[in-house]
A protein has these predicted regions:
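An interfacial alpha-helical scaffold signature
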Residues: 1-142
């Protein structure tokens, strides 16, 4: 099975942004869904068990931040000054989760009041979580 690369995702993102076409956005989602893992940033905590994927508030709405590769996750975490994402030795903690598990996690967050998902924040795309089931259906049908 073909696995998407960061570069492909960037190209698909540019295309979807410039064309605004549904099928270009669907291609982008498809590429993201085909990745073996999705990556989350998490704050440093005393107990590893307490670490949870970062949910940030933008426009007064809680969003879950997801990254298509570890490097992007680290880059974004470093932009948040005093966010607690970078440890004393300068490492960012990234949680990598198998994509099907990550999707289940995102779907479960809807009931916890999380509004949406933001992929590759800095240069990415986003969607309300309530649209996720329809996106999954649409992409998996295609």
């Amino acid at each position: 099975m073909h696995s998407s690369t960061s570069q492909e995702i960037d190209l698909l993102l540019e295309k979807a942004k410039s064309s605004g076409k549904t099928e270009d956005l669907a291609a982008l989602w498809k590429a993201a869904l085909e990745l073996p893992q999705w990556h989350f940033i998490t704050r440093q905590t005393a107990n590893i068990e307490d670490r949870k994927p970062f949910v940030g508030v933008l426009d007064n709405k809680p969003w879950i931040f997801v990254f298509t590769d570890r490097q992007r996750a680290q880059e974004y975490a470093r932009t948040i000054t005093g966010g607690g994402f970078v440890d004393e030795s300068g490492n960012v903690l990234v949680m990598s989760t198998d994509t099907p598990k990550a999707i289940d996690y995102l779907l479960a967050l809807t009931s916890q009041g999380v509004y949406g998902v933001r992929f590759n924040e800095l240069n990415g795309w986003f969607s309300p979580l309530q649209n996720l089931p329809a996106i999954l259906q649409h992409v998996q049908r295609g």
